């Protein structure tokens, strides 16, 4: 699995959000996250939509609005953040989606690909946001 810039920035965004939310004890603006992570507001807006649509963060409007984590850091998985941003964590494109590869029955590398996919999924789903905050 190659984690794209979008996936890395999504992880950075939720880590920064967790830190800033803990400090402020209030919703956090994208401006504050952008400044903390040196990422453009426009890019964070795209990520916020992805993360919000998957229920990882929530937003509120108004003078005291902003973003919050939808759950405690110990309950938010790195895998969920990456899947929200990336769409898929499959190591090869033929493992993505519901349609099986037409060469599945004769493919000599399928077991390696499936094994690799299982290891990646297991690992990223074992790392929580709380774990990342400790680093």
Question: Where do the PLM segments sit?
Answer:
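Beta-hairpin "wing" of winged helix-turn-helix
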Residues: 55-69
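Non-DNA-binding regulatory cores of transcription-related proteins
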Residues: 70-135
């Amino acid at each position: 699995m190659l984690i794209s810039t979008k996936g890395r920035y999504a992880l950075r965004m939720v880590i920064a959000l967790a830190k800033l939310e803990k400090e402020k004890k209030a919703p956090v603006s994208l401006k504050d996250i952008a400044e903390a992570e040196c990422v453009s507001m426009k890019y964070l807006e795209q990520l916020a939509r992805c993360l919000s649509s998957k229920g990882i963060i929530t937003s509120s409007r108004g003078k005291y609005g902003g973003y919050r984590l939808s759950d405690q850091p110990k309950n938010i998985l790195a895998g969920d953040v990456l899947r929200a941003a990336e769409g898929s964590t499959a190591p090869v494109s033929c493992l993505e989606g519901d349609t099986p590869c037409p060469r599945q029955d004769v493919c000599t590398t399928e077991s390696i690909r499936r094994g690799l996919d299982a290891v990646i999924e297991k690992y990223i789903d074992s790392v929580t946001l709380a774990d990342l905050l400790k680093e």
